[in-house]
């Protein structure tokens, strides 16, 4: 059975991801106490079901401490994948304010007994980060701070479609003006390269469009930058594989995340295609984005 565990920070889009998995034919359960997961998987497998998606969050409390070992145990019997959703505290506060929802840890005891109850939303968010931090290393992380719901659904679809063998190498483009992705393992700043934005004909395009590609490919400094990044990754990738990492996210950032970072992320993904499980995504470029869609909530 394939089991997708969705976890992360409340307000980061777990419901959106779970709905996307339900649409893809998964048997979905929200807020399942972790101790019931092995029993549920056994029951559903016996009932002929082969796809299960479960959302687990900080409301599980102390049970989260047992999750790392449970994931290891389940992985010996099933194809287990963990999807960890995250977002900046600022984005989360804005979402809770707009939806008028209460954070699940609001009013719960603080980590320090002398403090009493968690009264502010920011305190509850930070406490939740502490509780679920141990699960982040097991899964593929997605920073939803600037994502629209339809883009998250698309990324979840790609996540379940990819092969789950060895290290998955993710190249992610982004714009520094919207912040560095929280899910990045390596961040490369390419803002020093010539910017197609200042060419009026190239400004409305992206790094996927041929005129922008031709512009950047012709610049020796761009080729040198990509060569340096490629050499660095070629040197250190074996160490990450030996460490049994499931995912490695390489973030490429320019000013707006539309031209230079998109082109370089795509080019590097193509160069590393022979490595096997290579994924590319563009956080801030206007690609496959319906402007009428709401941000993840």
UniProtKB/Swiss-Prot annotation:
Binding residues annotated for GTP, in chain numbering: 57-60
Ranges that cross the membrane: none
A GO molecular function held by the record: GTP binding
Annotated keywords: ATP-binding, GTP-binding, Nucleotide-binding
Keyword hit for ATP-binding: yes
Binding positions (ATP): 8-15
Keyword check for Ion transport: no
Pfam families recorded: PapZ_C (PF22740), RapZ-like_N (PF03668)
NCBIfam families: PRK05416.1
Function noted in UniProt: Displays ATPase and GTPase activities.
Family: Belongs to the RapZ-like family.
HAMAP family hit by this protein: RapZ_like
Name this protein carries in UniProt: Nucleotide-binding protein Bphy_0322
């Amino acid at each position: 059975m394939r089991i997708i565990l969705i976890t992360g920070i409340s307000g980061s889009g777990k419901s959106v991801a779970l709905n996307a998995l339900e649409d893809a034919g998964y048997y979905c359960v929200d807020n399942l106490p972790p101790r019931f997961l092995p029993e549920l998987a056994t029951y559903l497998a016996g009932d002929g079901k082969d796809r299960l998606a479960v959302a687990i969050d900080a409301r599980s409390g102390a049970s989260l401490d047992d999750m790392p070992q449970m994931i290891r145990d389940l992985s010996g019997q099933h194809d287990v994948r963990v999807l960890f959703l995250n977002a900046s505290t600022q984005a989360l506060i804005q979402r809770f304010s707009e939806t008028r929802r209460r954070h699940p840890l609001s009013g719960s005891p603080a980590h320090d007994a002398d403090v009493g109850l968690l009264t502010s939303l920011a305190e509850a968010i930070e406490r939740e980060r502490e509780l679920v931090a141990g699960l982040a290393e097991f899964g593929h992380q997605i920073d939803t701070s600037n994502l629209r719901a339809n883009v998250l659904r698309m990324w979840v679809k790609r996540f379940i479609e990819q092969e789950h063998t060895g290290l998955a190498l993710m190249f992610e483009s982004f714009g520094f003006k919207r912040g560095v992705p929280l899910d990045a393992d390596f961040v490369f700043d390419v803002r020093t390269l010539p910017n197609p934005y200042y060419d009026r004909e190239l400004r409305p395009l992206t790094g996927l469009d041929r005129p922008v590609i031709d512009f950047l490919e012709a610049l020796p400094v761009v080729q040198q930058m990509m060569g340096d990044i490629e050499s660095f990754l070629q040197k250190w990738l074996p160490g990450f594989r030996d460490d049994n990492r499931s995912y490695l996210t390489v973030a490429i950032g320019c000013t707006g995340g539309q031209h230079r970072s998109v082109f370089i992320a795509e080019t590097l993904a193509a160069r590393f295609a022979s490595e096997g499980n290579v994924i590319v995504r563009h956080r801030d470029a206007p690609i496959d984005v319906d402007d009428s869609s709401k941000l993840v909530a």
